[in-house]
Amino acid sequence: MNRAHISKYINSLLADISKLSNTLCAMNNTDIERYPDNYGMLSTDAALHSELIACKMRHLLYGSTNMKKSEYLTSAGVVQGIRISEKDGVLNIFLPRLMPRRKGRKNSEFLTDPLYFTLSQYADSHELPKFQHCVICFSHIYSKELPLSRVRDYDNLELKQLLDVIAAFVMEDDSGLLCDAYNTTELGEQDCTCISVMGKERFSEWLEERENRLKSISDF
């Protein structure tokens, strides 16, 4: 990547950052109680711009330095707070944010790339299960301090690309015949997404445990 191309790319990033700054100012001046829909639109726009900026910055880093993609994205997973654990036959993946809307590859890339390398690093020191028949549960947790109008339909969320990443590590196949998907919306202390992968025989027990400990506002 030559100097002229780098400068052009940086100017594009600066323009995106300026748009983000303007949107954040608008958010700060919007009465969230009187105009929750406007605030929701602005916050969504700001979040998408932030993801776009992060992804563009990654590509600039890869193209203009000697930083390896795998090294950077492993660090990005740590910074984002992605956590992976296993307990009682359930693989749990914690994402400290809500799932992106279906708005294009870059919005998903912000999350899926670090997740892939975080799973890869975890697999280096842990023996991951390989499920033949499984259930993958997406728990979409919204901060109880913010308006319920923020809750989104599952059909508008980008789940398929995330499922493909997880499937590469723990599933023999993510087809409908071998994998059932379950979504739940809950209230919590902060926005986040918890993904639980388990054998079908474990699902009913997991669901009962979840209902006993979490306050749910809707299930699907």
Where in this protein do the model-derived segments appear?
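Short glycine/proline-enriched loop/turn "hinge" motifs that connect secondary-structure elements
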Residues: 83-87, 127-132, 187
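Short acidic, S/G/P-rich loop/turn micro-motifs used as interaction or catalytic elements
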Residues: 99-102, 143-147, 202
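Short, hydrophobic/π-rich interface segment
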Residues: 143-186
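Long, charged, low-complexity intrinsically disordered regions
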Residues: 88-90, 104-109
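An N-terminal amphipathic alpha-helical segment
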Residues: 107-137, 144-145
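Short amphipathic
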Residues: 83-99, 137-142
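N-terminal targeting/trafficking signals and adjacent low-complexity tails
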Residues: 1-66, 71, 76-80, 86-90
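C-terminal edge-of-domain segments
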Residues: 175-219
